[in-house]
From Swiss-Prot:
GO terms for molecular function: dCTP deaminase (dUMP-forming) activity; dCTP deaminase activity; nucleotide binding. Its EC number is 3.5.4.30. Residues 171-191 have a biased composition (Polar residues). DCTP binds at residues 101-106, 119, 127-129, 148, 162, 174. It catalyses: dCTP + 2 H2O = dUMP + NH4(+) + diphosphate. This is dCTP deaminase, dUMP-forming. Bifunctional enzyme that catalyzes both the deamination of dCTP to dUTP and the hydrolysis of dUTP to dUMP without releasing the toxic dUTP intermediate.
Length: 191
């Protein structure tokens, strides 16, 4: 079940769902807006001839931070990693989805490529996969509204929430935009 603004407030007030820093003005009818942090990971396209999800390519991206109040410029066709300013923490019976803001989508900004799901039990900054599909550069200001979290109550608490030993939870506690760690549990079925 998708949580309403009332339900979201109840969960925040009870300390079960946490967003730090929390701003009550970000609450929407069935979501809560989140803001863009000031750190970005840009791809070093000259490091490898291709991206290999089975290999450790930790140096595929480098961290960039705009100076002062300057925006980060996302060029047409460019893809970078960003993250939410807020740290989100979920209990074992609530999951979340990261969605973009309609106003930004109308400018050609995509907030996530495929990783819009946040598992119950997760705690950390949420990494955003930012892409510019417009024909002009887009200015991304640290602290601007960048997306929204929608929360869903599970039919029962997760037996093994994110962060438990069973799944490895490679991104638990992540700070800032975190590069892919797909190689740590790469699986390929012989076909």
């Amino acid at each position: 079940m998708l949580l309403s603004d009332r339900d979201i407030l109840v969960e925040i007030d009870a300390g079960r769902v946490a967003l730090e820093p929390y701003d009550p003005g970000m609450l929407q009818p069935s979501s809560i807006d989140v803001r863009l942090d000031r750190f970005f990971r840009v791809f070093e396209n000259h490091k490898y001839p291709h991206i290999d999800p089975a290999a450790d390519q930790s140096d595929l991206t480098r961290m960039v931070e705009p100076e002062g109040d300057e925006p980060f410029i996302l060029h047409p066709g460019e893809f970078v990693l960003g993250s939410t300013y807020e740290v989100v923490t979920l209990p074992d019976d609530i999951a979340a989805r990261v969605e973009g803001k309609s106003s930004l989508g109308r400018l050609g900004l995509l907030t996530h490529a495929t990783a819009g799901f946040v598992d119950p039990g997760f705690s950390g900054h949420v990494t955003l996969e930012l892409a510019n599909v417009a024909t002009l550069p887009i200015k991304l200001y640290p602290g601007m509204k960048i997306g929204q979290f929608c929360f869903f109550r599970l039919s029962s608490p997760s037996e093994h929430p994110y962060g438990s030993a069973k799944y490895g939870s490679r991104y638990q506690g992540q700070r800032g935009p975190t590069p892919s760690r797909s190689y740590q549990n790469f699986h390929r079925t012989p076909i």
